[in-house]
């Protein structure tokens, strides 16, 4: 089925409808699972030496010093244009503004007289950021991860990326307060952050995207007691666009293609009650595709994508909620009117002038988002991911006395005698004092 094929949703059977919203299967092959397991073992047992060996083997780079020096970081910044530095600073300002606003107010209440309950927030002490290498350095992800880590107050923020690390990544890391940067990539970087090595510190939580090996490494270390927590499950990137007859076909096409160029496994879906708009978008996609440097990649992604015609916008919303896209773009006449009905999406973009690119780079929202249907239970990355909540309770004598019989009754019903005794002993002590 080509992307030019218009699909009438209401002519499809329930089975066909489910198939249309089924994502391409992703699972680590047995060979990837075994390879990653071996890498984790080797890094845990051999440390820096094996990290250098893996750099030579996988990155074709001989690394002597794993830690990037301040002089190297300064030199990287000097090679960048002022225009790019100013753009990064503008993006960081917006990211700071949005994420600072996410600070939770403290909770301090009396649930009943003499029973005080609080909720306080503390930063995750140490975090590791992983940034992939490749021909297109993802320095924007540095901004998205390091900025909330700094706002949260994480004491240690370190970054790993495959050597040679792009100047843009080094500068972005320094700009956002990353304390240490290491020339380590792939699953071995995740292992180093999870277990520590002579050079790379062990961290409490690991953030960042990567290939199948990195994703599998994050999964494995997150399930080990000696490992580290991770940000969220990963999957291929995706966008769903809801458009009506008031949408601009060229704008819709550009948003679909900006997602499709991410990779051949990206998924793109258009939902519209207007078949004419669907046809015009398909034509615009073909026109714009011819001009893209990554046209081959985008074309592969489009082969698994969908143009779906519905009966109305309400049905578009229902289908979108069922799919739960990573990115949801609503290009309709009154886009904001639909927001309250949206229940599952990573990030929502409203109207003609809110392209996905804005959120990817500089509007202020975070571009690290749940994908592959995880929007049903997971949230977009935010300040809370770099923090943890802790509760505090304090009972006065009077508060304890008033609550004691309730606790004793509940503990006895669960046959937890020691729990009941912890209350009864105190009740008796109060009686003796009286």
Swiss-Prot record:
Pathway: Amino-acid biosynthesis; L-histidine biosynthesis; L-histidine from 5-phospho-alpha-D-ribose 1-diphosphate: step 9/9. Zn(2+) binds at residues 259, 262, 360, 419. Its EC number is 1.1.1.23. PROSITE patterns: HISOL_DEHYDROGENASE (PS00611). Signal peptide: none annotated. It catalyses: L-histidinol + 2 NAD(+) + H2O = L-histidine + 2 NADH + 3 H(+). The keyword Oxidoreductase applies. Keywords: Amino-acid biosynthesis, Histidine biosynthesis, Metal-binding, NAD, Oxidoreductase, Zinc. The active site is at residues 326-327. Its cofactor is Zn(2+). One of its GO terms (cellular component) is cytosol. Gene3D superfamilies: 1.20.5.1300, Nitrogenase molybdenum iron protein domain (3.40.50.1980). Substrate binds at residues 237, 259, 262, 327, 360, 414, 419. PANTHER family: HISTIDINE BIOSYNTHESIS TRIFUNCTIONAL PROTEIN, HISTIDINOL DEHYDROGENASE HDH. Belongs to the histidinol dehydrogenase family. This is Histidinol dehydrogenase. It comes from Salmonella paratyphi A (strain ATCC 9150 / SARB42).
């Amino acid at each position: 089925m080509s992307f030019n094929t218009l699909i009438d949703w209401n002519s499809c059977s329930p089975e066909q409808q489910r198939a249309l919203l089924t994502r391409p299967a992703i699972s680590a092959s047995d060979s990837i699972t075994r390879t990653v397991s071996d890498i984790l073992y080797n890094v845990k047992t051999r440390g820096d030496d094996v990290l250098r060996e893996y750099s030579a083997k996988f990155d074709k780079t001989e690394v002597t010093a794993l830690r990037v020096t301040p002089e190297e970081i300064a030199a990287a910044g000097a090679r960048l244009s002022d225009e790019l530095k100013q753009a990064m600073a503008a993006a960081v300002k917006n990211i700071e503004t949005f994420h600072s606003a996410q600070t939770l107010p403290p909770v301090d209440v009396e649930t009943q007289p003499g029973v005080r309950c609080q909720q306080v927030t503390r930063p995750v002490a140490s975090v590791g950021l992983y940034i992939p290498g490749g021909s297109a350095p993802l320095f924007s992800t540095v901004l998205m991860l390091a900025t909330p880590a700094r706002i949260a107050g994480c004491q240690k923020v370190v970054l790993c990326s495959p050597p040679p690390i792009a100047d843009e990544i080094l500068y972005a890391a320094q700009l956002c307060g990353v304390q240490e940067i290491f020339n380590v990539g792939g699953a071995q970087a995740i292992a180093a952050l999870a277990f520590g090595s002579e050079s790379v510190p062990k961290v409490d939580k690991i953030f960042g995207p990567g290939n199948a090996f990195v994703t599998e490494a994050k999964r494995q270390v997150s399930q080990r007691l000696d490992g580290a927590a991770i940000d969220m499950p990963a999957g291929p990137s995706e966008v769903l666009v809801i458009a009506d007859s008031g949408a601009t076909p060229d704008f819709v096409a550009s948003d679909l293609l900006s997602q499709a160029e991410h990779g051949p496994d990206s998924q793109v879906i258009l939902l519209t009650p207007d078949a004419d708009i669907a046809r015009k978008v398909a034509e615009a996609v073909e026109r714009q595709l011819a001009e893209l440097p990554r046209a081959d990649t985008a074309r592969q992604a489009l082969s698994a994508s969908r143009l779906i015609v519905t009966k109305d916008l309400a049905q578009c919303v229902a289908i979108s909620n069922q799919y739960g896209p990573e990115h949801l773009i609503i290009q309709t006449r009154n886009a904001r009117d639909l927001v309250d009905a949206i229940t599952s999406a990573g990030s929502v973009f409203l109207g003609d002038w809110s392209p996905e690119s804005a959120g990817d780079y500089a509007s202020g929202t975070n571009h690290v988002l749940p994908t592959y249907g995880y929007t049903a239970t997971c949230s977009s990355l935010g300040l809370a991911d770099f923090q943890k909540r802790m509760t505090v309770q304090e009972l006065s004598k009077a508060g304890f006395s008033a609550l004691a019989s309730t606790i004793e009754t509940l503990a006895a019903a669960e046959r937890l005698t020691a729990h009941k005794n912890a209350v009864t002993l105190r009740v008796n002590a109060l009686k003796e004092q009286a």
